[in-house]
Amino acid sequence: MRVILAPMEGVLDSLVRELLSEVNDYDLCITEFLRVVDQLLPAKSFYRLCPELHNQSRTQSGTLVRIQLLGQYPEWLAENAARAVALGSYGVDLNCGCPSKLVNGSGGGATLLKDPELIYQGAKAMRAAVPAHLPVTVKIRLGWDSGDRQFEIADAVQQAGATELAVHGRTKEDGYQAERINWQAIGEIRQRLTIPVIANGEIWDYQSAQECMKVTGCDAVMLGRGALNVPNLSRVVKYNEPRMPWLEVVKLLQKYVQLEKQGDTGLYHVARIKQWLGYLRKEYTEATDLFGEIRALKNSKDIALAIQRINR
């Protein structure tokens, strides 16, 4: 089976990708989206989003990384897709699933699910702009407020020439409600298409991954929030390994704080450290105590000291 690390805006930046790829066996990582409007973005925008471009589009551990684009104008998606691969990205991905109100309000992400023709035009333009040996992939949800057009959407992706399709098994309106997950619909899409389909949504452990693959018939899964809850989730899913012990998680957090300090000591990264702890609290009770201790702290140095005290 293949296991792919999902794009998660505001969460899975290059530093988190680096750490997670060190302790996992991901076959591919997708970046946070790069927003495309009506211009060709400068190279620095691509390098900022995906510093792995300097390393043949791989993390330091060797995991492949693919840039994701978000936008609604086919010609500019194409121009920026061409630049992404020219700079070294291992193909490009088109975001047609982000449920953020801010993103949707500007015509990107899940808004495209309302207009399968626009998905077709965007993916087709990107495919034409990218060399044939490199993948052009698309990530969707089942629809905007229902799954009535899921086949039309999936057909648009395949007919555009996309290499493969990742399907999150909920509509935009479903958000992340666990009870709304629809793996069966992913399976119906997989049966309909000839290109590979990747299943995404509510995969938290080995058992749920096995059940998802059984229901969908997919041999590839994409992990999102669960990859932050359980830092070694790809190994749990692939090999039925136990989840990472808490003290190993602490070592990851210690390294993360140091990486963040090297990059930016501003409140942005402090917020991301706290954000990751928020995810860890769902699986590790110890994370709740640590979160309570650092919640009021304002700089990476103080947070690092708090985390270091755990091993003493």
Swiss-Prot record:
InterPro entries: Aldolase_TIM, DUS-like_FMN-bd, DUS_fam, DusC, DusC_C, tRNA_hU_synthase_CS. SUPFAM superfamilies: FMN-linked oxidoreductases (SSF51395). It is an enzyme of class 1 (oxidoreductase). Its cofactor is FMN. Keywords: Flavoprotein, FMN, NADP, Oxidoreductase, RNA-binding, tRNA processing, tRNA-binding. FMN binds at residues 7-9, 68, 139, 200-202, 224-225. The record marks 35, 95, 176, 272, 274, 279, 295 as: Interacts with tRNA. PROSITE patterns: UPF0034 (PS01136). One of its GO terms (molecular function) is tRNA binding. It catalyses: 5,6-dihydrouridine(16) in tRNA + NADP(+) = uridine(16) in tRNA + NADPH + H(+); 5,6-dihydrouridine(16) in tRNA + NAD(+) = uridine(16) in tRNA + NADH + H(+). Its EC number is 1.3.1.-. HAMAP family: DusC_subfam. Belongs to the Dus family. DusC subfamily. PANTHER family: TRNA-DIHYDROURIDINE SYNTHASE, TRNA-DIHYDROURIDINE(16) SYNTHASE. This is tRNA-dihydrouridine(16) synthase.
